[in-house]
Curated annotation (Swiss-Prot):
InterPro entries in alphabetical order: Ribosomal_uS4 (IPR022801), Ribosomal_uS4_bac-type (IPR005709), Ribosomal_uS4_CS (IPR018079), Ribosomal_uS4_N (IPR001912), S4_RNA-bd (IPR002942), S4_RNA-bd_sf (IPR036986)
Keyword rRNA-binding listed: yes
Gene field: rps4
Name of the protein in question: Small ribosomal subunit protein uS4c
Keywords for this protein: Plastid, Ribonucleoprotein, Ribosomal protein, RNA-binding, rRNA-binding
Family recorded in the similarity comment: Belongs to the universal ribosomal protein uS4 family.
Domain S4 RNA-binding: 89-149
Amino acid sequence: MSRYRGPRFKKIRRLGALPGLTNKRPRTVRDLRNQSRSGKKSHYRIRLEEKQKLRFHYGLTERQLISYVRIARKAKGSTGEVLIQLLEMRLDNILFRLGMAYTIPAARQLVNHRHILVNGHIVDIPSYRCKPRDIITSKDKPKSGALIKNSIKAFPREELPNHLTLHPAPYKGLINQIIDTKWVGLKINELLVVEYYSRQT
């Protein structure tokens, strides 16, 4: 299944706020009520919707999400927590979290167009897995710097998660540690996502 490119507001009306996909939110309380008045949900539908939240928020294809679930299952610790950590440490998500891009799709475009450096080297793979002590900067070109600056000014982050630091112009992001999952800005039950895939195999 390919990455979703359709109407974004349609997804947040059904699934709730997805800050990685769009900075828009359901317009009214009625929109949110409509989500809960569609009848009693089956256990399957609840698990499916949690999976869809994760997929659309991080901008993943179905195949990519399955791959991350498999990696998380093989790692030590809670599969759900490891899954979230893997997704949060993607380069496109780190850029979004730092405020260098206003959504994850916008961050992916920055990376694909070779505007981003990790530890002084161009990285053009949005799924690149960042690690502690990595330094994220823009390429030393006026256009690259302007794109980052405009995003930070237009959509300033009120508070950064404690695993990230953003230094002012020239903007530089530093990864301090692996994310603590309490900082994930998405209302999600990751265990239901793991259950969803466990029942599919």
